[in-house]
Amino acid sequence: MRGMNTTLMQMTVLMLCGAGWRVLTPNRLSADQTRLVLTSVVYYFFMPVMVLDVLWRADIGWQSLQYSALGSISILLSILATWMLAKLFRFKNPQTGAVILAAAFPNVTYLGLPVLEQIFGDWTRSLVIQIDLFAEAPLVYTLGIMLARHYGATGEPKPKSVLAFFNAPPFWAAFVAVVLNLNQLPIPFWLAGLLQKCSGAVAPLMIFSLGLALSWRDIRVRNLPFIAPTALIKLWLMPLIALWLASLLNLTGQPRTAAVMDLAMPSMVMGIVLCDRYKLDSGLYAMAVTVTTALSLVSLPLWYRVL
């Protein structure tokens, strides 16, 4: 438990450094400009390198299907629960779309990866990447966009083919890594060292970027009726669903604990992009990210103790 608290304290300090950048704007670089650069570097270079490094070595098999099923079903059931709640309280469309995205899609990589890696070790990189690339990301780029379009402004241009969303560096890296893995091709010694060094840059850049995305200016009293159920579903109901599913899927030990905790992470940052593009309530979503991230500093240690 002490290790968990120490890890979260370290993550919090690094996030606060990112949040401090928003206030100080060194060299007149705004937080949004800096975050765009950092997240682009991670997405187009460091993340694919880490995906290649991890999945090339990973034990891909039945457990990969377990992770995929656990992540996918947990997200789908959370979407259903949030939709029912939005219907019950008669949320308007822009708020409904934002709340569904915030409650159902966890920050499995940008926060989950560094937290789980620090607590359980490097082996969790494989777990996080498989939940992200084989469960959450496909749902974000398909069902997530469909929901955003449905609840957002009308008149949006026809979306690209679903396959076009997967024409991205992390997915290509995953494809190459899985092919190399299944063909049992060894990683050259010189390349292994390079991949590991580059992979080490991902976690601190992710945490700092997350801090850049947080803004207390987005906190609005009028949004509290939407934020309370969002946080309840994201930080408590979804992990309960994941815990129940993990038992059905025969996941045990540390893999079960790490997988459930990954799905207990706060709202993903990327959802703000979908809210902006499809005219959902972006302010509400930004507040959900800030509040659930802050509350996760309490909920994650509790889940760690329970699991």
Residue ranges and their predicted role:
Residues 1-307:
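Alpha-helical transmembrane segments of multi-pass small-molecule/ion transporters
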